[in-house]
Regions:
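Sequence-structural signature of the catalytic-core scaffold of metal-dependent phosphohydrolases
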Residues: 1-30, 34-85, 95-173
Length: 173
């Protein structure tokens, strides 16, 4: 649909080639694949497409922000990179069988609120904790929360500056 998608080498070798990301090839995106048997509808291809659209959005926001804010250009660009990373990794927390398997995250021994606590512990900022406690169960789906956790834990070399974890998690959830 989008033609060739350019992905920086640092993302290709560290993220796209990782087992965490490659498993998305085996998670079906939609249940319509029997209707279009030659189409590829998996979370891997979907995530690459979301990344591509995210790069377009980030560049446009970056250009607009440069005209209306006093933030340094490098800081604006860095936030754009974190947003793009969140776009790429937004589905890495999917359970097997995609949304059908999401109920696994809500079983008796791992309550929904415990998933929120895992994310709060991972991000570890007062503002994020306050927002999660206020909105818990009202906004993010379990796979989105797990995607933020998996992204932060699996790719710490890409989420390093102060505030990166929080911004990354907010982009996904």
């Amino acid at each position: 649909v989008y033609g060739y998608i350019k992905i920086p080498m640092k993302y290709m070798s560290d993220i796209v080639d990782s087992a965490v990301f490659q498993r998305l090839r085996r998670i079906i995106q939609t249940s319509y694949s029997p209707l279009y048997s030659s189409a590829v509808h998996n979370r891997f291809v979907h995530s690459l497409g979301v990344y591509y659209l995210g790069t377009i959005a980030a560049k446009n926001v970056e250009r607009e922000l440069e005209n209306i804010t006093e933030m340094k250009k490098e800081d604006i660009h860095h936030l754009g990179e974190i947003f793009e990373l969140a776009c790429l990794l937004h589905d890495v927390g999917h359970a097997p069988f995609s949304h059908t398997g999401e109920k696994l995250y809500l079983s008796d021994d791992l309550k929904y609120n415990q998933i929120h606590k895992l994310l709060v512990d991972e991000v570890d900022t007062k503002s994020f904790t306050k927002d999660i406690e206020h909105y818990a169960g009202k906004c993010a789906a379990p796979h989105e929360i797990m995607s933020a956790i998996v992204g932060i834990r699996a790719f710490p070399n890409h989420i390093v500056k102060a505030g990166d974890k929080e911004f990354f998690a907010r982009c996904i959830t």
